[in-house]
Amino acid sequence: MAADQGTFTTSVTLSPVEGSRTGGILPRRAFRRSCDRCHAQKIKCTGNKEVTARAPCQRCQQAGLRCVYSERCPKRKLRPSRAADLVSADPDPCLHMSSPPVPSQSLPLDVSESHSSNTSRQFLDPPDSYDWSWTSIGTDEAIDTDCWGLSQCDGGFSCQLEPTLPDLPSPFESTVEKAPLPPVSSDIARAASAQRELFDDLSAVSQELEAILLAVTVEWPKQEIWTRASPHSPTAFPERITQRRHNMWANWLTDLHVFSLDPIGMFFNASRRLLTVLRQQAHADCHQGTLDECLRTKNLFTAVHCYILNVRILTSISELLLSQIRRTQNSHMNPWEGSRSESPSRDDTSSTSGHSSVDTIPDFSEDLPIGELFSYVDPLTHALFSACTTLHVGVQLLRENEITLGVHSAQGIAASISMSGGPGEDIARTGATNSARCEEQPTTPAARVLFMFLSDEGASQEVKSAGSRGRTIAALRRCYEDIFSLARKHKYGMLRDLNNIPP
């Protein structure tokens, strides 16, 4: 019996246990305390309460499974000579890392209870004559080493057999992502490309208008935005009138700053480009499809945004013009009017002082062109007429943009502004009367959006009670009316003076 059993280093003999992989005899304490199923799930095994008697655990019995105990993995290396023998005995060193499952029915039950736990925890070196070779494994008991991760083993004896789950395909992976996109009709692709090009053009105009609005509302009030005319000092004026009238003329030109607004051309050009893009959008091919409708909606809101930017820019410019003209008008007098107010008649002035109103005119620059003569001689009239021209052109561009967007000519902002005064007042009133009779409603999507923008115009007669949009439109109407009213008064006075000039 002693020849068939393994010998412990502490001279304690255990009962033989049949190996699960071989028919040979293995030391009793070479097996785990837990069965393979409990060990894999890392839970406490209830079947091996006694050291030597390995009965099936309760979990395996309840599940109706076979309770198997495998060999422990050595915690220290064998002697080099014995390790070399084990490696050379089998070409696959990973199979020696742990013993195969042992049937619970083959475990001996006659081992005494006197074996201590300290002795069972020691690793036992079997004698050199012990045969570790295992018989060939049957086909039904073969283990897939790739599935259990044994193919990654490096042959070391510190490796422990741990069941690992195989790499399963992700449930989120689908072949739909790799499937080719459905073919798109050439008409749909052409219409979508045209709408995208229109959006790019509208975006470029929108960015330019936003930059102009920022300059008008933030930068222009902080710096000199008008071109100053350098008054030339008169040299032939008499001492008693020269100094006062020369100072008056210099202040005129310095404070009024002859009207020359450089960015106004940029603003008008941007408005014309917007009108061109809107006309292209109106004549673009329309395709009945979801994509085409979405692209058209995006272009619609971008176009309305550009139109609102035009309204706000024109409002800010008109406020700057009116404030500058009023400040200059209240501070100084026109040199021509000043000369006439000082003397009751031209003959009396010439007889008493020996000078006429021509003496109030400053010296002219030798390179002064004819086109700048009027602004040099009468800067107030020139500024008023320039402001009227600016507002007139701006309102015309607004009206054309409204018509292109589908707004009736008598229902837009341009019509409400023109009714307050200025050129084309009678035509605008006639159109407004006809529109009130017809009571036409907005027909295009853009017109409906602009109608929402103009919805509070009915309450914008009083600026304080109107909303932000109503305040903007009311301010534009007020500046338009005041500037044209000042221009008409000044024009009538100038014509009256011209008619009173003797030949």
Curated annotation (Swiss-Prot):
Stored InterPro entries: Carb_Metab_Trans_Reg (IPR050797), Zn2-C6_fun-type_DNA-bd_sf (IPR036864), Zn2Cys6_DnaBD (IPR001138)
UniProt DNA-binding residue ranges: 35-67
PROSITE patterns, A to Z: ZN2_CY6_FUNGAL_1, ZN2_CY6_FUNGAL_2
Keyword Oxidoreductase found: no
Practical uses of the protein: Lovastatin acts as a hypolipidemic agent that works as inhibitor of (3S)-hydroxymethylglutaryl-coenzyme A (HMG-CoA) reductase (HMGR) which reduces HMG-CoA to mevalonate and is the key step in cholesterol biosynthesis. Lovastatin, simvastatin and related compounds are widely used to treat hypercholesteremia and reduce the risk of cardiovascular disease. Furthermore, statins such as lovastatin were found to be anticancer agents.
Segments of skewed composition (Basic and acidic residues): 339-349
Organism listed in the record: Aspergillus terreus (strain NIH 2624 / FGSC A1156)
CDD domains tied to this protein: GAL4
Location within or outside the cell: Nucleus
The protein's role, per its UniProt record: Transcription factor that regulates the expression of the he gene cluster that mediates the biosynthesis of lovastatin (also known as mevinolin, mevacor or monacolin K), a hypolipidemic inhibitor of (3S)-hydroxymethylglutaryl-coenzyme A (HMG-CoA) reductase (HMGR).
Compositional bias annotation for Polar residues: 1-14, 350-359
An example Gene Ontology biological process: positive regulation of metabolic process
Official protein name in the record: Transcriptional regulator LovE
A Pfam family assignment: Zn_clus
Ranges where the record places region Disordered: 1-21, 89-124, 331-362
Xref: PANTHER family: GLUCOSE TRANSPORT TRANSCRIPTION REGULATOR RGT1-RELATED-RELATED, MALTOSE FERMENTATION REGULATORY PROTEIN MAL13-RELATED
GO terms, molecular function: DNA binding; DNA-binding transcription factor activity, RNA polymerase II-specific; zinc ion binding
